[in-house]
């Protein structure tokens, strides 16, 4: 009988490991408390929610390292330990305690996913062997322990290759190498983080897809959420704009990847929650499994908030031995947790970078994380969600369009010119579009505004044409609003009654409504109408708001209920939208 549980917390905040693990740890502690279990937390970071009074029964502000944890286990004698709620640090610490024999010495039961399953997913060589047993495709790779082995592996696989460090978080030490010089430099960095390095054949340009899968001890499995990265493979998922649910997968692609994710979680024997990342060839249904995280991850926190399904809470209960069918859905309070959420909205996660604060850091994005945080936006359309998200980042942007110049001028190849020819570009687009930077989304906006085709931008960025079509739709609405710039001029001279006659002119009110539906703020609309030339922009935004209210163009409050309104929701989880 489990009466006392030790939870390894999220530890210090660092790039790649931030508030997401505080969120999952807090949820797990609440789940244990509900069961009347005494909880002990180890977390050196005092500025977290999980270390607040009343969340855990006892808190140790000690580093999440095997030596310190062993002393606390010897003193507290817990019955069980949870490893998957503190990110990579907690997972590595748990594996070390297991290998040292500390857990068996003090008779501490690992709750949820067995340690061997964690080792199978973290050790790159073992991981590939385990997936080969069930005929699941992985990226062609070789595990190496020396720089000499890395060089030999790269020669065998053929360039370009990607290097990945084992047991590392946030793509630490990973990078793409096109030649031997880059390889040796990257290998040196990777070995400084980990004793084992994986050399993989590069699949740059493939789509990156993620599934969040939950399994209980009775072998019941569900996929809670699937997500798609706007950027193709080659940019770390923590650096990319992520959309949930996926938007560009066909029905057969979606179900094929879902079935494989469930097959993997069953074969490895994970109990609780795990994250499966895929590379998918945009030209066929060919796929590769990139990695499996046998823990709550950044993506889990996003999936949890995006769907309203409390992943960490459920995972903690499953670790105690419950089945999915025995747990209540915390949103509806009537259905069980054994269901797959249905979403009638779109969620966008957008990273935030603060690269100006770090001296000498390249603005180029790659397979290693640089972002320091992220925002999540909810809308009824992709356009609305991405515009809301870009406003929320807090870096002075007003949305996808309507910003002052954010990138250097772009010179793209003209029709008929070869997209890969270096002669077609000046220096700026190489950094803006060909090589992704933290402002690439605004470089895409600028290229669309300059009249370049979706196909040209797709060739440069490898962003899916569906996303580019939606982004072009935002630019088209902005252009349509600019055709009504005479309204801002007339507003200076005309009294309200006469002005309203012009506002009511054919097509404008429909356009105003469409702009709001697709995520335009009053500020963006005022800027597109040219109010900036004549008025303070704060006042101009209020003018647009006044017009909207006059013609009843107002937002609705929508509820996130996990079941697309099939059952009434008891939880107040809300968002505003114009449809």
Regions found by a protein language model. Name each.
Residues 152-161:
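Acidic/histidine-enriched active-site and ligand-binding environments that engage anionic O-linkages
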Residues 3, 9, 22, 27, ...:
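ATP-dependent carboxylate activation and anion-phosphoryl transfer catalytic cores
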Residues 460-469, 527-546:
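Short, basic interhelical loop/turn and adjoining N-cap
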